[in-house]
């Protein structure tokens, strides 16, 4: 059967919170089959566990924020994206603040951490959410949509009307049957505009944001001396975010995702719309790994890496 996966050993790192500017400790621990991805606020007098789920996402203005009984863990999408890309089903994520450290602004550090810990198959079938009917959410000219598809592919289009962004690829389509997440998506960094960063700092946010963990743009150009990691890094990062946003549903999707100018809020609304229609999806497993979509087999310790 196609099996669930966790990590082999505990692994730790320290990074900066993009909003608080504080030093944050992050520990990844193996978890039993059926656990899912569980975030734990170990800095609190009594640690609080928050399982990743579509219904636990609260605030989506600047990141995907998991919430439970007034306790928050923010900026989970890059780590969730790495877990999706590497096929991690079960994991405990201990964090000493209300946000996951930003690291370099991409998913690459989290991929490295997980690969350093090692990936282990577990004796339980991997559960997929198979989309059976189209589901779509719109907000003005923005939209996000899921269609039935035997595999996992995404098509994302952006439109920032900024000279430096417009010079790069605005549209990207990726099918993970033939594309490496680690090589083609994981290193794409978050990006922001210098004038917005100043406004955010004035209200106590983005205190840890810098060119070490983001692509920063002024009105005309990219300010980072080293430029871009990919020619189409902007749209690739939006896709990286979408992969993480979608993975909070708790299982890998068998679906085709299409989006135009979507963000964390629209992605979460799409998951909620899917879950609201029980006839639009089903949970499936694969007794024969060869019968699963290409890209999900336990190959080179990755999912579609």
UniProtKB/Swiss-Prot annotation:
Q: Name one Pfam family in it.
A: LpxC
Q: Which organism is it from?
A: Burkholderia cenocepacia (strain ATCC BAA-245 / DSM 16553 / LMG 16656 / NCTC 13227 / J2315 / CF5610)
Q: Which HAMAP family match?
A: LpxC (MF_00388)
Q: Which GO terms describe its molecular function?
A: metal ion binding; UDP-3-O-acyl-N-acetylglucosamine deacetylase activity
Tell me the gene name: lpxC
This one is known as UDP-3-O-acyl-N-acetylglucosamine deacetylase
Cofactor(s) needed by this chain: Zn(2+)
Q: Where is the active site?
A: 264 (proton donor)
For this chain, the family text in UniProt reads: Belongs to the LpxC family.
Q: Which GO terms describe its biological process?
A: lipid A biosynthetic process
Q: Which UniProt keywords apply?
A: Hydrolase, Lipid A biosynthesis, Lipid biosynthesis, Lipid metabolism, Metal-binding, Zinc
Q: Name one GO cellular component term.
A: membrane
Q: Which residues of this UniProt protein bind Zn(2+)?
A: 78, 237, 241
What pathway does the annotation place this protein in? Glycolipid biosynthesis; lipid IV(A) biosynthesis; lipid IV(A) from (3R)-3-hydroxytetradecanoyl-[acyl-carrier-protein] and UDP-N-acetyl-alpha-D-glucosamine: step 2/6
As for what it does, the entry says: Catalyzes the hydrolysis of UDP-3-O-myristoyl-N-acetylglucosamine to form UDP-3-O-myristoylglucosamine and acetate, the committed step in lipid A biosynthesis.
Give the superkingdom in one word.
Bacteria
**Coiled-coil annotated spans:** none
Q: What is its EC number?
A: 3.5.1.108
**Catalytic reaction list:** a UDP-3-O-[(3R)-3-hydroxyacyl]-N-acetyl-alpha-D-glucosamine + H2O = a UDP-3-O-[(3R)-3-hydroxyacyl]-alpha-D-glucosamine + acetate
């Amino acid at each position: 059967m196609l099996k669930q996966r966790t990590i082999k050993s505990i692994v730790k790192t320290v990074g900066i919170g993009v909003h608080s500017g504080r030093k944050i400790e992050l520990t990844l621990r193996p978890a039993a089959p059926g656990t899912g991805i569980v975030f734990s606020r170990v800095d609190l007098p009594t640690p609080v566990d928050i399982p990743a789920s579509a219904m636990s996402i609260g605030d989506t203005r600047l990141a995907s924020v998991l919430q439970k009984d007034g306790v928050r863990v923010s900026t989970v999408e890059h780590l969730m994206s790495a877990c999706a890309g590497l096929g991690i089903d079960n994991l405990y994520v201990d964090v000493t603040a209300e946000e996951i450290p930003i690291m370099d602004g991409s998913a690459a550090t989290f991929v490295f951490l997980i690969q350093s810990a090692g990936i282990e198959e577990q004796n339980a079938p991997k559960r997929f959410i198979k989309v059976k009917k189209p589901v779509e959410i719109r907000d003005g000219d923005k939209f996000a949509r899921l269609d039935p598809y035997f595999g996992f592919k995404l098509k994302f289009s952006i439109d920032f009307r900024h000279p430096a962004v417009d010079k790069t690829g605005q549209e990207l389509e990726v099918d993970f049957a033939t594309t490496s997440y680690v090589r083609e998506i994981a290193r794409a960094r978050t990006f922001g505009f210098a004038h917005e960063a100043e406004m955010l700092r004035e209200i106590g946010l983005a205190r840890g944001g810098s060119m070490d963990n983001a692509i920063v743009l002024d009105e005309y150009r990219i300010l980072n001396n080293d430029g871009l990691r990919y020619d189409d890094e902007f749209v690739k990062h939006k896709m990286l975010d979408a992969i993480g946003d979608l993975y909070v549903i708790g299982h890998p999707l068998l679906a085709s995702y299409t989006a135009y100018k979507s963000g964390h809020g629209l992605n979460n609304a799409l998951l909620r719309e899917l879950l609201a229609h029980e006839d639009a999806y089903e949970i499936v497993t694969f007794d024969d790994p060869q019968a699963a979509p290409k890209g999900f087999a336990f190959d080179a310790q990755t999912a579609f890496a």
